[in-house]
């Protein structure tokens, strides 16, 4: 049986795995599904429809799965889907989607630090870190292993590529290329995330390919974006997976990317 503190309020229709622990003064709504090993410390609020995999941990005053803060939202059925082994620290807030039948989605092994926020319809991958007070507005996509540093603010519909880093207090209104670091107000691309790539085990060839992309797209001011991509396609690293991913990201960007 789940371990539920007497002061917690858990709706009888909520689906709670047998080994879940729910601490004092928590509130769990009707349409919530908590998988094995989830732990709710005190004063956690979880509403739904929302589902959580195994091993998720919720710290005091985190508020997860409440309705969208979008003014267009009129109470339609929307969802929050969360994977495994995520940590939601104090005051973190995650909202459900806005569009009928839509879902905010969070993968596995993510860390949401103090007072961060992921808005409606966000699509967040795996091993992502939201640092303290980092904010992602509605419909933001965040790739695997990305890091959002403290107090940064990400505009609606922005895509942040995998292994990218957003600097503290950055204002991000355009897409962030994979493997890069952006910072500033407004955010601009400062460098390749070399240290992050090394920590994740990328090869020296991968680093060289990404550095070449950075030089073509950001350093060589004589090239248009189209010309830079053509040169990359015909370079010695044309078959490199990181290079091909950057090209794909640029070509599919709908907001342009931070320069």
UniProtKB/Swiss-Prot annotation:
Function: Involved in the biosynthesis of lipid A, a phosphorylated glycolipid that anchors the lipopolysaccharide to the outer membrane of the cell.
GO-annotated biological processes: lipid A biosynthetic process
Family per record: Belongs to the transferase hexapeptide repeat family. LpxA subfamily.
Principal localisation: cytoplasm
SUPFAM superfamilies per the UniProt record, alphabetical: Trimeric LpxA-like enzymes
Transmembrane segments: none
GO cellular component terms, A-Z: cytoplasm; membrane
Name the UniProt record assigns to this protein: Acyl-[acyl-carrier-protein]--UDP-N-acetylglucosamine O-acyltransferase
Catalytic activity entry: a (3R)-hydroxyacyl-[ACP] + UDP-N-acetyl-alpha-D-glucosamine = a UDP-3-O-[(3R)-3-hydroxyacyl]-N-acetyl-alpha-D-glucosamine + holo-[ACP]
Family annotation (InterPro entries): Acetyltransf_C, Acetyltransf_C_sf, Hexapep, Lipid_A_LpxA, Trimer_LpxA-like_sf
Annotated GO MF terms: acyl-[acyl-carrier-protein]-UDP-N-acetylglucosamine O-acyltransferase activity
Source organism of this protein record: Akkermansia muciniphila (strain ATCC BAA-835 / DSM 22959 / JCM 33894 / BCRC 81048 / CCUG 64013 / CIP 107961 / Muc)
